[in-house]
């Protein structure tokens, strides 16, 4: 296996608010990260596991990306 195949470069979210494009790029990397409560410009990014909801945040909240990155690192399931 080549080193480039072993390591995947994953896109994370900025520490503050994030855009739909950023959320879609992150959600596309994981089996358990979803966009929900879509209201057009505002939506929630959600992490779930077998037991249900782990964490969710609105895309415009202060520190939304920081905390979501933390949760995804701990609970995200890569595709």
UniProtKB/Swiss-Prot annotation:
Keyword Cell wall biogenesis/degradation: no
Domain of life of the native organism: Bacteria
Keywords, sorted A to Z: Plasmid
Disulfide-bond pairs as recorded: none
The keyword Hydrolase is annotated on this UniProt entry: no
Protein family membership: Belongs to the UPF0401 family.
Name the UniProt record assigns to this protein: UPF0401 protein YubL
């Amino acid at each position: 296996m080549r080193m480039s195949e072993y390591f995947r470069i994953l896109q994370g979210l900025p520490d503050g608010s994030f855009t739909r494009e950023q959320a879609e790029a992150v959600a596309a990397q994981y089996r358990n990260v979803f966009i929900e409560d879509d209201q057009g410009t505002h939506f929630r990014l959600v992490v779930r596991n077998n037991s249900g909801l782990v964490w969710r945040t609105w895309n415009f909240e202060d520190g939304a990306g920081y905390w979501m990155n933390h949760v995804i690192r701990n609970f995200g399931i890569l595709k």
